[in-house]
């Protein structure tokens, strides 16, 4: 069969994933049935890396061991020190993407190796490249980077052209004019 290609919205505060199946978009829940995964990474007292809800709980106890809002620093080389472990924003994003990949594989019952990832329209080419790198670190081939708020809705099937998301605010044609670095858009 065709490998599953999921759409991932790697958000600043929350991330989510979806897949195009049977002519419709299906949101992918995690093991607990949550569709949104907090974009938070933490290192607990034993040095274990936590992501999502577990990391958010850690943030309430010890915010110094947690990183959030790191998406905007992708591609800048800024480091985060979490309890003595150093991370680049790409590495933190990769941990969130890996968490999403695992949830998707559990939900779909098949391997997920590719994704379409949405980023803010203002992301420059460094940030877009950093997003692809984060996906690579998570074991995901990121075939396309698109401008949010589209990924979950525009989960691409094989060779399917990305069109306008019904109910979305903007069409991709409009965004193309505003954003010079649209070369990754199909």
PLM features: what roles do these ranges have?
Residues 1-38, 43-185:
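N-terminal phosphate-binding loop and flanking beta/alpha elements of the actin-like ATPase fold
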């Amino acid at each position: 069969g065709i490998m599953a290609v999921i759409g991932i919205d790697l958000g600043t505060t929350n991330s989510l994933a979806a897949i195009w199946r049977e002519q419709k978009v299906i949101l992918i829940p995690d093991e607990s049935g949550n569709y949104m995964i907090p974009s938070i990474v933490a290192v607990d007292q034993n040095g274990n890396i936590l992501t999502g809800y577990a990391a958010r709980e850690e943030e309430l106890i010890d915010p110094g061991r947690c990183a959030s809002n790191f998406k905007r620093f992708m591609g800048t080389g800024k480091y985060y020190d979490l309890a003595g472990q150093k991370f680049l924003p790409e590495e933190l994003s990769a941990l969130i993407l890996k968490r999403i990949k695992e949830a998707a594989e559990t939900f779909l019952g098949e391997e997920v190796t590719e994704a379409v990832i949405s980023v803010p329209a203002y992301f420059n080419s460094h940030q877009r490249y950093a997003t692809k790198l984060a996906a690579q670190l998570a074991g995901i081939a990121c075939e396309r980077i698109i401008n949010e708020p589209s990924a979950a809705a525009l989960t691409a099937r094989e060779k399917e052209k990305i069109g306008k998301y019904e109910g979305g605010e903007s069409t991709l044609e409009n965004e193309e004019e505003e954003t010079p670095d649209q070369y990754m858009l199909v």
